[in-house]
Amino acid sequence: MKSAFTLSLALVAVTATISAAADDNCSFGCLDVYKPVCGSNGETYSNSCYLRLASCKSNNGITEAGDGECASTPASSATPSPVTSSTGSTSGTVGCPDMCLDVYDPVSDENGKEYSNQCYMEMAKCKGTGYDDNKRSGNPGISTLDAERKLAFAPGYQGPPCGDMLCPDNYAPVCGSDGETYPNECDLGITSCNHPEQNITMVGEGPCPSQEQQQQQQQQQQKL
C-alpha cells in the first residue's frame, strides 16, 4: 500500500514537471489576425498561430484539420471558443474575430455594403451587425498599429511564428542597423524576426544614406 502511494506521488511530480515545462515553452504571442482554422479537437482558432499555441499547451495534442471555421463546436465543450486576442481577451460571440488589421482593402458583401477589408466584413456577418470601425471615405490611410506589433518567442520553440506576421502595403521607409532600407518598420521587424542572430534594429526613419552620402557626412564631421 505504501509503495502504491509513493508511486502515485512520483507520477504527480512528473506530471507537474511536464506541465511546468510546457507552460515555459508556450509563452509566444500571436498576431490578432482573423484567418480562422479548424483544430482536430473541433474548436475554431483565430489563426494557425493560436492553434499552435493551444497545441503547445496540450503537449502537441491538437493538429490543424482544415482552413476556415469548424462546421460546429462540440456541445459538450464547457470552455469558450479559443478565438482570443494576444492580450487574452475573448470574443463576445463564439467564433467571431475581436479585431482586424487597420488595412484599407475594400470589399462588398452580397447586399452591396462596403467594408474596409475582408476581416471587417466577416466580423459584421458573424456578429450580425453592420460594424465596420475601419470604414473610411476619401483618402485611405494605414494605421501604424500593425507595424508596432511584436511577437514574443519561447526558447526552443520549433514553430515558424515569423511566418504569421503580416505587414501593411505602405511605403514609410526606415533604415536598419544592417545598413538596409526597409519599406516600413513592420518589414524590418519581420527580417529581424527571421534573422535574430543579426539583431537588426531601426536606426532612423527614411532610407539609409548611400555610401557617397556617408562619406560626405564623415568629411563634414572631420571639418568640424
UniProtKB/Swiss-Prot annotation:
GO terms for cellular component: extracellular region. Residues 69-92, 202-224 are annotated as: Disordered. Keywords: Disulfide bond, Glycoprotein, Protease inhibitor, Repeat, Secreted, Serine protease inhibitor, Signal, Virulence. Interacts with host subtilisin-like protease P69B. InterPro entries: Kazal_dom (IPR002350), Kazal_dom_sf (IPR036058), Prot_Inhib_GrowthFact_Antg (IPR050653). Residues 23-72, 90-127, 156-210 form the Kazal-like domain. Glycans are attached at residues 25, 199. It comes from Phytophthora infestans (Potato late blight agent). The gene is EPI10. Gene3D superfamilies: 3.30.60.30. Secreted effector that interacts with and inhibits the pathogenesis-related P69B subtilisin-like serine protease of host tomato. Inhibition of host proteases by a pathogen extracellular protease inhibitor forms a specific type of defense-counterdefense mechanism between plants and microbial pathogens. Induction: Expressed in zoospores. Expressed during host infection. It comes from the Eukaryota. Disulfide bonds join 26-56, 30-49, 38-70, 96-126, 100-119, 162-193, 167-186, 175-208. Residues 1-22 form the signal peptide. The keyword NADP does not apply. CDD domains: KAZAL_FS (cd00104). This is Extracellular protease inhibitor 10. Residues 71-92, 211-224 have a biased composition (Low complexity). GO terms for molecular function: serine-type endopeptidase inhibitor activity. The record marks 32-33, 102-103, 169-170 as: Reactive bond. Its main location: secreted. It is found in: Secreted.
